[in-house]
Amino acid sequence: TASLCRYAIKHGFNGFQFLAGIPGSVGGAVSGNSGTALGHAGEIVREVWTMDSLGAERKVSGSQISWGYRSMNLPQGFAHKPVIILGAAFGFSPAQEEQNLEREYRLLLEGRKKTQPWGPGLAGCFFKNPPGLFSAGALIDRAGLKGFSVGDATVSPVHANFLVNRGKASAADFLLLMEKVADKVRRQSGVSLEPEVKVLS
């Protein structure tokens, strides 16, 4: 997503700025409908190329997809799921004459760096924000879990909805940390957190 965002800004394509600082691949951004308060992937996707579990490839229009909070639901007819995102086509609008895309991008990136952990070993926000007054990060913080670790998998002390690999954390470490965090939040706040990341196996 970082490369796509930079390419769009370099060529004056407006509407991609919300991707600034969002980690991961373009396929992951489409599959998870990545976004922020400024926009999300489903708003700019025009077509998606997929391959199902039997190897059959198919193209689907972005308007046929039901885009939800951190999710995309394909139309009926995709019997052999899950599908892999092979590619996507995006729509854009030209930047306005007075608009400075580079400045907008830089300000967004600087803002994220002040409020979120940065660098390798990150998967973005780990849990979906539940309905209600408090975000997932606020609930985890209220549970006193900033800095809590399982092996090298750690709840970021900067932003509690980021789980960070401090060096040699395994997938098992992250899964156990995810379970422990969700369990404590559920016991303390009565809220069941749902992972934003996709656990494949």
Regions found by a protein language model. Name each.
Residues 38-39, 117:
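Short Gly/Pro-enriched turn/cap motifs at secondary-structure boundaries
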